[in-house]
Every structure is written in C-alpha cells, then in structure tokens.
C-alpha cells in the first residue's frame, strides 16, 4: 500500500455530531482543501484549517488502513472536509479501503463536484446565501481581510445543482443538511428541494453556530419550524459536548 502522503489532515474516532446518524460511533477522515469560503451570521467555517487556510496532508493509505485495523469495534466511517469530492481518485480509493474493513461510509460534501463512489450515504450540505463571505471583514483564523475574490469564488461554487443531482442519483442514500441562520433561509431550502426533487423527510435543518450559546439561541425556533413544516431537526452534538474543539 502506497506511502505517499495524502491531503488528509485528520483521522480520529468520534460520535457523528449531525444528521440521521447523530450519536453513532464513527471513524472520521478529514480531507484538506475546499472551494468555498463560508462566513455565516455569527461564525465562519467550523474547519478553516481545511478551507480558508488548508493544512498540508499528514496521512497515507497505509495509515488509513491501519487505523481501521486498530478500531474494529467501529463500523461507520465519515469522509469529510474541506471538500472530499475534489480529490476524486483518493476518495474512491478511501472508500475501497473502508469497504474492505466492513465500513458503512458517509461522504460529507458541499456538493460542488460529482464523483461516483462506494459510499452508502451522501450527506449533502449545500450552502445557502447566508454563507456568502463579507468583503472587508477579518477572518479570525487567518487574520486576513475577506476579499471580493473570496466572495466571487464562493458564489461560483456554492450551488452546483447538476453535481448535487448526480451525487443523489448515484448513491444508495442521501440527506440534505443545510445550515440555518434565520427563518428566512427556509425559502432557499424549499427552492433547493424543488430543483433537486428532495422530499421533506430527507431534509435535516441544522442551526448555525460554533458556540453553545449560538446554538441555544436558534434551537427553539428552529425545532418549532421543523415541527410546523415537517422537516427533521439535527443538532450539533460535538459543539454541545466539547465546544469549538478539534478532533472530536
């Protein structure tokens, strides 16, 4: 198995923090690099080390295989980012290794690029207009000013409907997991559903926030909205338990 270092900056065990498998033990593989530059109402991207300032890779295919071997009691894997579908050949190979180790595979993606894989669940998190970066503000992780180029790049890729449709059609299961900042975001969610043909029971609305206080502010009205409109609600378990920490 190759010893080439891959654009993977984290591998660890955790409970899935979001979506239909929330609370299920997973092996998380985080891929570095993303086309988007998310900035929400109260927060930036929660993994800026994979997007705004992507770290270099640290792991090989051999490392990934050995991690599976060391954790045989965990049967679910999520491959996330960053944007894992940007690294097509690597993603296909990671899925092959995971399947050889009897894993259920979730691929978490913003949906900007299509790739057909052995993944079991596509966790599709298309970014609404509430994620568009604001030129002139400071990105805390990098200390740099957000530019018009950041905004232009983000807007170019945040809603690739063709790629999202192909991801849905070419995998056994999927969920749509948009980040919600305010009630007005619901109109964009409904438009996404209309374009992609997604029923309500496949949608998990998730409150924006990197701090417990931010989640608390949105949780009540969002759960009420989900009940009223017939959507699933998903919390952010890792933030509730650990706050904005890495490796959890």
Model-derived features with residue positions:
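Short coil-to-beta-strand transition motifs
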Residues: 2-4
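Conserved Radical SAM active-site core
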Residues: 6-13, 25, 36, 40-122
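Short secondary-structure boundary/capping segments within folded domains
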Residues: 17-21, 33
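Short, solvent-exposed loop/turn segments at secondary-structure boundaries
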Residues: 21, 55-57, 216
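Short, histidine-centered active-site or binding-site loop motifs used for metal coordination
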Residues: 33, 49, 209
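Conserved AdoMet/S-adenosylmethionine-binding subsite of the radical SAM
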Residues: 65, 85-248
């Amino acid at each position: 198995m190759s010893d080439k270092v891959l654009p993977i900056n984290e591998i660890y065990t955790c409970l899935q923090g979001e979506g239909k498998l929330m609370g299920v033990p997973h092996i998380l593989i985080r891929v570095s690099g993303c086309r988007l530059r998310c900035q929400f109402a109260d927060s930036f991207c929660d993994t800026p080390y994979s997007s705004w300032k992507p770290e270099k890779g640290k792991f090989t295919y051999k490392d990934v295989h050995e991690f599976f071997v060391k954790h045989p009691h965990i049967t679910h894997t999520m491959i996330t980012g960053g944007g894992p579908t940007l690294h097509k050949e690597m993603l296909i190979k990671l899925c092959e290794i995971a399947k050889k180790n009897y894993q259920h595979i979730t691929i978490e993606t913003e949906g900007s690029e299509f790739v057909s894989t052995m993944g079991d669940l596509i966790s599709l998190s298309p970014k609404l207009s509430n994620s568009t970066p604001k030129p002139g503000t400071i990105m805390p992780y990098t200390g740099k000013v957000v530019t018009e180029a950041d905004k232009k790049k983000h807007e170019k890729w945040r809603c690739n409907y063709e790629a999202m449709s192909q991801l849905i059609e070419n995998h056994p299961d999927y969920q749509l997991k948009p980040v919600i900042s305010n009630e007005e975001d619901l109109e964009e969610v409904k438009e996404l559903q209309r374009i992609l043909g997604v029923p309500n029971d496949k949608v998990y609305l998730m409150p924006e926030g990197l701090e417990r206080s931010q989640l608390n502010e949105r949780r009540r009205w969002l759960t009420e909205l989900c009940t009223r409109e017939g959507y699933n609600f998903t919390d952010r378990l890792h933030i509730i338990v650990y706050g904005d920490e890495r490796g959890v």
